[in-house]
């Protein structure tokens, strides 16, 4: 068995958003049950809160399909006709050829932190369409596996990460992909702004937690785009609050001190 993820990044014609949502959670989800190796499928909408606000967000929606496939060459392309149903019904706005379907062979399943409440659904996910610096692939993998992944998933509201590499197996339409490395992060937070701000604070050594990330490795190319999405599909949603296995006391103290100034 091999883990894969397929991202369907798309836009929907104005006025047909509810129709697409009903299709995804109705006929489409029913059809997905016939696919071998499908582990999970959910749909997300781009968040107004982004860690890199100047980066364009070309897609309003993303559908995420997670697989554990017995034979990827046979099974992965089977998703294609099911996605084509939405396109054929006019539910995908693609006049600008913005639709993207990217499939990644994942290096592993989720790496999780004590933050993750496994009995609860995610509030959202973020993706990085990433690249490594040429000639430094092994260093890039080591940095993510042994340093940066742990730093990220322990930020309040961030709960897990898994990574992968762009697969040779792709679903039509095959179009330009800006990153051959995928960094997929899971969130459980109803305060994404707090989560993102503390991520940045830890990266800069300014977090009330006292936790500071190591300097970013130059083995990770700056040619990357980051996209945060909120979960919109299914009938179970994050219960509220910010998932964190650590101590919130330093954050509360910092907030109180700021209010007293």
Sequence positions of predicted segments:
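Macromolecular interaction modules
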Residues: 1-261
């Amino acid at each position: 068995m091999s883990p894969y993820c397929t991202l369907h990044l798309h836009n929907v014609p104005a006025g047909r958003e509810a129709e697409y949502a009903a299709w995804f959670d109705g006929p489409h989800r029913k059809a997905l049950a016939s696919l071998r190796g499908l582990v999970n499928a959910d749909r997300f909408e781009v968040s107004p809160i982004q860690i890199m606000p100047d980066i364009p967000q070309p897609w309003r929606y993303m559908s995420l399909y997670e697989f554990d496939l017995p034979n990827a060459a046979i099974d992965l392309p089977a998703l294609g006709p099911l996605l084509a149903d939405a396109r054929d019904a006019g539910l995908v706005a693609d006049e600008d050829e913005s639709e993207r379907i990217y499939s990644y062979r994942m290096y592993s399943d989720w790496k999780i932190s004590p933050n993750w409440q496994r009995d609860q659904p995610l509030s959202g996910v973020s993706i990085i369409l990433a690249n490594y610096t040429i000639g430094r692939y092994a260093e890039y993998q080591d940095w993510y596996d042994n340093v940066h992944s742990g730093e990220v998933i322990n930020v309040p509201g961030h709960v897990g990460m898994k990574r992968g590499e762009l697969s040779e197996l792709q679903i039509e339409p095959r179009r330009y992909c800006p990153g051959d490395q995928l960094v997929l992060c899971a969130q459980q937070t109803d305060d994404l702004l707090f989560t993102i701000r503390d991520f940045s604070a830890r990266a800069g050594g300014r977090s009330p937690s006292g936790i500071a990330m190591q300097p970013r490795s130059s083995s990770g190319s700056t040619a990357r785009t980051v996209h945060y999405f909120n979960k919109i599909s299914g009938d179970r949603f994050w219960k509220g609050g910010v998932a964190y296995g650590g101590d919130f006391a330093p954050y509360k103290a910092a907030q109180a001190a700021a209010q007293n100034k």
